[in-house]
UniProtKB/Swiss-Prot annotation:
The keyword Transmembrane helix does not apply. One of its GO terms (molecular function) is succinylornithine transaminase activity. The modification N6-(pyridoxal phosphate)lysine is found at K252. It comes from the Bacteria. Its cofactor is pyridoxal 5'-phosphate. This is Succinylornithine transaminase. Pathway: Amino-acid degradation; L-arginine degradation via AST pathway; L-glutamate and succinate from L-arginine: step 3/5. The gene is astC.
């Protein structure tokens, strides 16, 4: 008989780059999870915007099992039917002409930045290597992407960092304009800064970036790792803004919980990447591709995308009512089912404590820095699950407020 597993085993065996919750989930269905002791949680964290169709969705299980019974992996010396079908679905649904598959958002962003540098080098010369990104951004944990992310706490211990990356203020087109010039090869931006506090870009800001990139022959990269695949109520957030990037990165919800990432590119951009210029062992493997193909099939429908907008209203209405009672938040913001509740000055820096109280009450939420409680639930979360989960969240807020005033 195998040894029982406990949360303490994490502290014994794992490299301590995470600080997981004190409970261990063991089973999920829809927007509900159960831990080792059988306690139920409503899941509004969604694996950090990954579980777009909830846990153990029957059609995703079927797609995975069907492919698993055929073959799992061949490597990039061969292609496969599921990955080609998935590529065609993404191309048909977006601006893209070409796709590169990988395993995560960080890998997709790494590929995008490498492509941008090579595109500029091949077309304009080695002087055009500058990358403009934004303060409080998050683009992944590779050395290149953590340098592009404008959060020194994630990068300062790993110097020397890749050179020629500068950071402007987000949503400030004048700040960006001061940095973007003819030496810039690319601008990388999140349409909504997720880890940076659930901060949506303004239309004028993204349109201004498009114009600056056009003027200076720089590529515009949209990091849609968190906002993509229906999260905002459109298949990709760029569709809200009417601003089309040259490159787009996607991951998280694309696999519905199965690891997969992708870089979407125009034909003009893609042609600079030739055999051997980039690659990955597992990217585009048939298991991930089969699942992701089913995810796109289920999410890219008017019913599902309109349902996300309806669910946004459910959340915001109930969160506003809750906030009227407890006075925790100065602002509730976001698009679709990526929602951030900004703590007011009286509770600044205590988002983690609220998330811990929420877990005790049986609801899982995220944070985005010390001042924002973040919600990224399944796109098909039911109204009953929203009501039950927010009732539990209200109980957690009541306990948090009463504890602070006692």
């Amino acid at each position: 008989m195998s040894q029982p597993i406990t949360r303490e085993n994490f502290d014994e065996w794992m490299i301590p780059v995470y600080a997981p919750a004190p409970f261990i989930p063991v089973r999920g269905e829809g927007s509900r999870l159960w831990d080792q002791q059988g306690k139920e949680y409503i899941d509004f964290a969604g694996g950090i915007a990954v579980n777009a169709l909830g846990h153990a969705h029957p059609e995703l299980r079927e797609a995975l099992n069907e492919q698993a019974s055929k073959f799992w992996h061949t490597g990039n010396g061969y292609t496969n039917e599921p990955v080609l079908r998935l590529a065609k679905k993404l191309i048909d649904a977006t601006f893209a002409d070409r796709v590169f598959f990988c395993n995560s958002g960080a890998e997709a962003n790494e590929a995008a930045l490498k492509l941008a540098r090579k595109f500029a080098h091949d077309r304009y010369g080695s002087h055009k290597s500058g990358i403009v990104a934004f303060k409080n951004a998050f683009h992944g944990r590779t050395l290149f992407t953590v340098s592009a992310g404008g959060q020194p706490a994630y990068s300062q211990d790993f110097a020397p960092l890749p050179a020629d990356i500068r950071h402007a203020a987000y949503n400030d087109i004048n700040s960006a304009s001061a940095l973007i010039d003819d030496s810039t090869c690319a601008v990388i931006v999140e349409p909504i800064q997720g880890e940076g506090g659930v901060v949506p870009a303004s239309n004028a800001f993204l349109q201004g970036l498009r114009e600056l990139c056009n003027r200076h022959n720089a590529l515009l990269i949209f990091d849609e790792v968190q906002t993509g695949v229906g999260r905002t109520g459109e298949l990709y957030a760029y569709m809200h803004y009417g601003v089309t990037p040259d490159l787009l990165t996607t991951a998280k919800a694309l696999g519905g919980g199965f690891p997969v990432g992708a870089l979407l590119a125009t034909e003009e951009c893609a042609r600079v990447m030739t055999v051997g210029t980039h690659g990955t062992t597992y990217g585009g493997n048939p298991l991930a591709s089969a699942v992701a193909g089913k995810v796109l099939e289920l999410i890219n429908t008017p019913e599902m995308l309109n349902g996300v907008k309806q669910r946004h209203d459910w959340f915001v209405e109930r969160l506003n009512t809750l906030n009227h009672r407890y006075g925790l938040f100065s602002e509730i913001r976001g698009l679709g089912l990526l929602i951030g509740c900004v703590l007011n000055a009286d509770y600044a820096g205590q988002a983690k404590q609220i998330s811990q109280e929420a877990a005790k009450a049986g609801v899982m939420v995220l944070i985005a820095g010390g001042n924002v409680v973040r919600f990224a639930p399944a796109l098909n979360v039911s109204e009953e699950e929203v009501t039950t989960g927010l009732d539990r969240f209200a109980a957690a807020c009541e306990h948090f407020v009463s504890r602070g005033s006692s």
